[in-house]
Amino acid sequence: MKIAYVVSSKKKCGPNIVILNIVKELANKHEMEIFFLDESDDDVFECVNVKSTQIKKASDLKEHLKRFDIIHSSGIRPDALVVLCKVIYRVKCKIITTIHNYVFQDLYYSYGLVKSLIGGLLWCSIWLFFDKLVILSKNADNYYWFLPSAKKNIIYNGIDDNDCLQNKKCNYRKEFNIPDDGILAGSCANLTKRKGIDLVIQTLTKEHKIYYIVAGNGIEKHNLINLVKARKLHERVYFIDFLDEPESFMSQLDVFLMPSRSEGFGLTVLESTKLGIPVITSNIPIFMELFDQMCLTFDIKNPSTLIDVITYAKKNRLHLSQKFHAIFQDRFTSSKMATKYENVYNNLFREVL
């Protein structure tokens, strides 16, 4: 098969990591090429021997896509361009997209009610033209009840389960003078309201021996810093910039926190579990489905419960990390994910013949 991937850019982000892991697993079996729209400082695909081509306009993409059997896009602009090529330019291939979010919730937390409704309806309309839609969970399948059932496939995300831990570039306990008996918690996120970092900050006090490091940037970062100042937690909560390789940071934590109000999947949960770090998530439905018995949870409507859960995770770290890692290997490896995507590609390819 000849498979093309169309993405917004080559920067490191959740949807691109999913594409990367599919390519890693299947590139030796199929002809592949990655098309991207925007330049970026980093290139998540540089580790794979697959050609990548920048697209400036839809007509350029049309000429490229004529060579492929399957087109797999990710993101609103790539989705729109692929549909344009399929419907307007009559490119004869099968098209598939992965829906990584809960579109109305996701856009609401970033852009507000009006833009989320307009953007969400537009994006959902675009999805109707695809031959296949990959949904990341049963919960998301129910959320998108209005999309044709025959087009939807549920495939859980997966990550590479090989050991790829880099040398420590920074000792975070030493950097922030965190005592040996302090519990070091952390999160990696694009800092928006949806990620729920404020819930953790509002729960912590100086009386607790819990220290919290937040790795990431985003529109909410300034507000979070001000919240830390208002609660006088500058000796408990610290911010560092987005990390291209977060594994070293995660490996130094006692517990990883994922306090999201809404989430499409949560790849950092898998990354932390792979490293043997216990994970605590909010009890939103998507996490309860995906990570049942693989993570600890706290009540998002009663965030004060988080303190007890963090303390429990620290005391039982060894047992929890072994238990959670075994479940990760059973459910969420990139090889399992890629096999399911390949099955979808094969079914579409038979329709092309």
Curated annotation (Swiss-Prot):
A motif (E(x7)E) lies at residues 263-271. Changing E271A: Loss of glycosyl transferase activity. No activity with UDP-Glc, UDP-GlcNAc, UDP-Gal or UDP-GalNAc as the donor substrate. Changing G119W: No effect on glycosyl transferase activity or donor specificity. Very high GlcNAc-transferase activity. Higher Glc- and Gal-transferase activity than wild-type. GlcNAc-transferase activity with very low other activities. Disruption phenotype: Loss of LPS O-antigen production. GO terms for biological process: Gram-negative-bacterium-type cell outer membrane assembly; lipopolysaccharide biosynthetic process; O antigen biosynthetic process. It is found in: Membrane. It comes from the Bacteria. It is a single-pass membrane protein. It is an enzyme of class 2 (transferase). PANTHER family: GLYCOSYLTRANSFERASE. This is O-antigen biosynthesis glycosyltransferase WclY.
